[in-house]
Amino acid sequence: MKLRPLHDRVVIRRSEEEKKTAGGIVLPGSAAEKANHGEILAVGPGKALESGEVRALSVKVGDKVVFGPYSGSNTVKVDGEDLLVMSENEILAVIEG
């Protein structure tokens, strides 16, 4: 199955969760914090403006992005993988380099 987001939404694969602390202590799955960054897998066509024009998104497929801890509350399971669907305005930054 493939997701095609609508409007200004993006589909993101969350990066692997950190399973160790900085001191090297291994955390059980329930104690590990979910990563707040990931890779964009699909983008919608853009945001519809009042004038009827569509403003293209600032992010593209393949971008590594950072989002807030409560962003992407819409989780969809596709081919056994949990993916996040969120609006572009929930993305805080693009990771470069």
From Swiss-Prot:
<comment type="similarity">
    <text>Belongs to the GroES chaperonin family.</text>
</comment>
<protein>
    <recommendedName>
        <fullName>Co-chaperonin GroES</fullName>
    </recommendedName>
</protein>
<dbReference type="Pfam" id="PF00166">
    <property type="entry name" value="Cpn10"/>
</dbReference>
<dbReference type="InterPro" id="IPR011032">
    <property type="entry name" value="GroES-like_sf"/>
</dbReference>
<dbReference type="GO" id="GO:0005737">
    <property type="term" value="C:cytoplasm"/>
</dbReference>
<dbReference type="GO" id="GO:0051082">
    <property type="term" value="F:unfolded protein binding"/>
</dbReference>
<dbReference type="GO" id="GO:0044183">
    <property type="term" value="F:protein folding chaperone"/>
</dbReference>
<dbReference type="GO" id="GO:0051085">
    <property type="term" value="P:chaperone cofactor-dependent protein refolding"/>
</dbReference>
<dbReference type="InterPro" id="IPR037124">
    <property type="entry name" value="Chaperonin_GroES_sf"/>
</dbReference>
<keyword id="KW-0963">Cytoplasm</keyword>
<dbReference type="GO" id="GO:0005524">
    <property type="term" value="F:ATP binding"/>
</dbReference>
<dbReference type="InterPro" id="IPR020818">
    <property type="entry name" value="Chaperonin_GroES"/>
</dbReference>
<dbReference type="GO" id="GO:0051087">
    <property type="term" value="F:protein-folding chaperone binding"/>
</dbReference>
<comment type="function">
    <text>Together with the chaperonin GroEL, plays an essential role in assisting protein folding. The GroEL-GroES system forms a nano-cage that allows encapsulation of the non-native substrate proteins and provides a physical environment optimized to promote and accelerate protein folding. GroES binds to the apical surface of the GroEL ring, thereby capping the opening of the GroEL channel.</text>
</comment>
<keyword id="KW-0143">Chaperone</keyword>
<dbReference type="InterPro" id="IPR018369">
    <property type="entry name" value="Chaprnonin_Cpn10_CS"/>
</dbReference>
<comment type="subunit">
    <text>Heptamer of 7 subunits arranged in a ring. Interacts with the chaperonin GroEL.</text>
</comment>
<dbReference type="GO" id="GO:0046872">
    <property type="term" value="F:metal ion binding"/>
</dbReference>
